[in-house]
Design a protein with these regions (language model features):
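Beta-sandwich/jelly-roll carbohydrate-recognition scaffolds of carbohydrate-active enzymes
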Residues: 32-296, 302, 315, 686, ...
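Acidic/histidine-rich catalytic neighborhood
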Residues: 442, 446-492
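Beta-rich accessory regions
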Residues: 33-36, 154-159, 167-187, 483, ...
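Bacterial Sec-dependent N-terminal signal peptides
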Residues: 1-35
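Low-complexity, Ser/Thr/Pro/Gly-enriched N-terminal "stalk/linker" regions
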Residues: 34-39, 48, 287-320, 372-396, ...
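Carbohydrate-binding/catalytic loop surfaces
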Residues: 322-334, 379-402, 458-477, 522-535, ...
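Active-site core of glycosidic bond-cleaving carbohydrate-active enzymes
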Residues: 336-369, 373, 393, 397, ...
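Catalytic cores of secreted or luminal carbohydrate-active enzymes
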Residues: 107-120, 621-670, 674
Length: 764
């Protein structure tokens, strides 16, 4: 079987890092999956969302975004169409004016506003598709007076929202009406928060101006910064185009109106520009591929990839809880005790490491904030972050919180697990040595500084808060994170020959660190504190997932894992959406595809909204994205120096396929299951090194595009086989193939579950 040559596209993103970091280019080389393997237009058309009527709220709206700017389209009532406008980096800056108020009020996300269109007739139905392959919404809205056809998109490479409308028959829509958002923390407008400042003025009134066909809505901030929504209407409301942009100046150092105006003036909607927009999205999707026999789940997975590139980009801000789609929320910030971790979790396996640059860049640029977040006596060698922050990552952990045990010590350490994954998936040793390792060392030091030794020499962690549960000593949240950090530091120090003077101390602490507290029901929250009430977080189980310190491949720990999972899930009333994705991921790690599938289906049935957004008291972006990670973990898992192919496939799935999913060791992996059997595995080694595969593939031949003879070892591992190739060649593609494998262009097999499903609002 001939090997396919892959097209590579390289882009250079210049990341400007503040001192003491240098200005360095981040180079992304991405292999595109060719059309000979996937009929991309046909396959992606199956992933579209469809609306038979306009949604009535944020969670049933049509969402479009480019990583910074976004819109959400729905109806306020049967004669009013609403277009929410959002820009994800627009935050307040009154922290110096109100130093006693919390950052959720002084540095909160701010709503931009929305447009409305009033229809003459009553809206009766719609025929709209969100074409995620082209990132365009298009279709028609029917009223009792006629129809309105429309197309909307947010340009991939320009910060402009474009909406084209054409009303027909007797339908006459009124003009576009702009409604500025109230420039105040959305949390302040919620009823339940008890931390509201006593004196909290709104930002100054907006200033509306019109100049040369452009309309400007400038919203000043109390610190003399501001943001401007600029728009231009070509034609009229019944037949024309609306162009919208938003400029932002957080610190009175830029001209936000000029920025928005230039965006509109430079916008080009000719065929070449539209093609460039579409091509950006096409190249993005073609970096990896997943096909499932369950249409609902397959569609959901691809929509999450669409949402990821809609909420962040390599050169855009870190993703918060809303992305570019603002809404009423008590959480107008970035959360560090689970949410951000889950948001970025799918990017590695999906082969979209470039999206992680928004997070990694933020950690590096705001390194000093992370240092200043710890008490002054530890700033020489430690760093941390509290529960939530704005984009500057300022979230101090105070001496008073430490003394009371009310703080969450391990938030930064858990976050750095994902930064370390960037290394394991790329083998980028320079980034490991110069950025990841030093920051991980500081994060570990923050925990080490607080350890207390008992009379037996065992190190314990004093009272701290286990997220959303209780204050406890020896919290498993903290101990598991410290244990992972120490093991990782020791490993990196050895492999990179860094000769770190602290290596001996790390080994001593790790050897004498308190054991993870365990009771009759499995892992406890912490010392003498069992989980005996419903708890949506799985932070007390991080040693199982995602750290894999305690895992299913350790026979002595299988009962403990099962018991801990059962106890956590038996208390159901407080379980949230991410509890279900967490359960699915843990079951996938237990090689139980049926239970992973069951928990994901229950998540879809109970919690997932029509546009796949997720709601609690406000929007929280991470849960659907975490579910995408759970789906990946059913298909492939790479940890502990092994790549596991189809480790947790549901028994009802007979055919599934993936291409160019990225694995630890910098391998791109493709695999096909046909009629319940693994028939083909293809691996491209990007950095060389040892390759260890675990699969249920019984009989196969192995070949390479770089050499005629391949030395490998084959072992029995339970009911599966382990294949070890000690020396792969950089750029080499290896293929393990069954004689009965039949290669087909995707889409290659019919759906067996939810065959007629489309997300959106439609008859299923």
């Amino acid at each position: 079987m001939p090997f396919k040559k892959l097209k590579y596209t390289c882009s250079i993103l210049k990341v400007c890092l503040l001192a003491p970091f240098l200005v360095m280019p981040f180079i992304v080389c991405v292999a595109q999956i060719p059309g000979s393997e996937v009929n991309w237009p046909a396959f992606m058309a199956r992933q579209n969302l469809k609306w038979d009527n306009l949604g009535k709220d944020y969670y049933s709206g049509i969402i479009l975004g480019n990583g910074l700017l976004g819109t959400n389209i729905y109806k306020e009532n049967d004669s009013l169409i609403r277009f929410d406008i959002g820009r994800s980096d627009v935050v307040d800056h009154r922290e110096k004016l109100m130093p006693g108020a919390g950052k959720l009020y002084t540095q909160s996300r701010l709503p931009i506003g929305y447009f409305t269109l009033k229809t003459e007739g009553k809206i009766t139905s719609a025929k709209i598709e969100l074409d995620i392959y082209n990132a365009e919404a298009k279709g028609s809205i029917s009223t009792t007076k006629g129809t309105i056809s429309f197309t909307a998109f947010v340009a991939a490479n320009q910060n402009v929202i474009s909406v084209s409308l054409d009303a027909m028959q007797q339908e006459k829509v009124s003009g576009w009406e702009w409604n500025p958002g109230k420039s105040i923390s959305p949390r302040y407008l919620q009823a339940y928060p008890t931390d509201k400042p006593a004196n909290y003025p709104e930002n100054p009134p907006v200033k509306m101006t019109i100049d040369n066909g452009y309309t400007f809505c400038n919203q000043p901030l109390l610190n003399n910064g501001g943001y401007t929504t600029a728009y231009q209407i070509n034609g009229n409301a019944s037949s024309g185009k609306l162009l919208v942009s938003v400029g932002y100046d957080g610190y009175n150092s830029l001209d936000e109106t000029e920025e928005a105006l230039n965006n509109l003036k430079n916008f080009n909607a000719d065929k070449e520009s539209i093609a460039a927009h579409r091509n950006w999205w096409h190249r993005y999707y073609q970096q990896s591929f997943v096909a499932l026999p369950d249409k609902r789940m397959e569609n959901f997975y691809w929509i999450q990839l669409y949402k990821l590139a809609s909420i962040t980009r390599a050169d855009k801000p870190i993703a918060d809880l809303m992305g570019p789609w603002t809404a009423a929320t008590p959480w107008p910030a970035i959360w560090w005790n689970l949410n951000t971790q889950l948001t970025y979790s799918p990017i590695f396996t999906a082969n979209h490491l470039e999206l992680g640059e928004s997070l990694f860049k933020s950690l590096n640029v705001h390194r000093q904030s992370l240092i200043n977040n710890v008490p002054v006596q530890w700033r020489n060698d430690a760093a941390a972050i509290g529960r939530s922050s704005s984009y500057d990552l300022v979230s101090p952990i105070t001496d008073a919180e430490i003394s009371k045990g009310t703080f969450e010590p391990a938030n930064l350490t858990w976050m750095l697990y994902y930064y370390y994954q960037y290394y394991t998936y790329t083998k980028d040793e320079q980034t490991l040595r110069t950025k990841i390792y030093p920051l991980l060392k500081r994060s570990a030091n923050f925990l080490i500084h607080q350890l207390k030794q008992d009379e037996k020499g065992i190190y314990h962690f004093p009272m701290s808060h286990s997220p959303e549960y209780k204050n406890v000593e020896d919290a498993n949240y903290t101990l598991s994170s410290l244990s992972w950090a120490l093991q990782t530091l020791i490993k990196v120090n050895g492999e990179q020959q860094l000769k770190d003077a602290d290596a001996g101390k790390w080994s001593l602490i790790l050897k004498n660190l308190a054991a993870f507290p365990v009771g009759d029901t499995g892992f406890l929250i912490g010392k003498d504190v069992p989980l005996n009430s419903s708890h949506r977080h799985y932070s007390h189980l991080l040693m199982i997932y995602p750290y894999n310190l305690v895992n299913w491949e350790q026979p002595e720990n299988k009962e403990l894992i099962s018991l801990s999972l059962k106890n956590w899930l038996m208390y159901k009333n407080a379980l949230a959406g991410f509890s279900f994705s967490g359960a699915a991921s843990i079951y996938a790690g237990m090689e139980n595809g049926d239970m992973a599938y069951q928990w994901l289906n229950e998540l879809f049935d109970r919690f997932m909204q029509p546009n796949t957004l997720y709601r609690e008291s406000g929007p929280v972006i991470e849960t659907p994205l975490a579910a995408a990670t759970s789906i990946q973990e059913m298909l492939i898992q790479s940890w502990g120096d092994k790549i596991r192919i189809f480790p947790a496939i549901p028994s009802s799935w007979k055919d599934t396929s993936f291409k160019q999913l990225r694995a630890e060791g910098a391998f791109l992996v493709s695999a096909d299951m046909q009629n319940g059997q693994t028939k083909n595995i293809r691996i491209t080694s990007l950095k060389g090194g040892t390759l260890t595969l675990v699969s249920n593939m019984a009989k196969f031949s192995i070949r390479s595009d770089k050499r005629s003879k391949i030395d490998y070892q084959q072992y029995k591992e339970g009911e599966k086989i382990k294949i070890e190739i000690r020396k792969t060649i950089i750029g080499e593609t290896l293929q393990l193939v069954s004689t009965s494998f039949e290669e087909k262009q995707a889409p290659a097999f019919p759906y067996s579950e939810y065959q007629n499903w489309f997300w959106g609002l439609n008859k299923k």
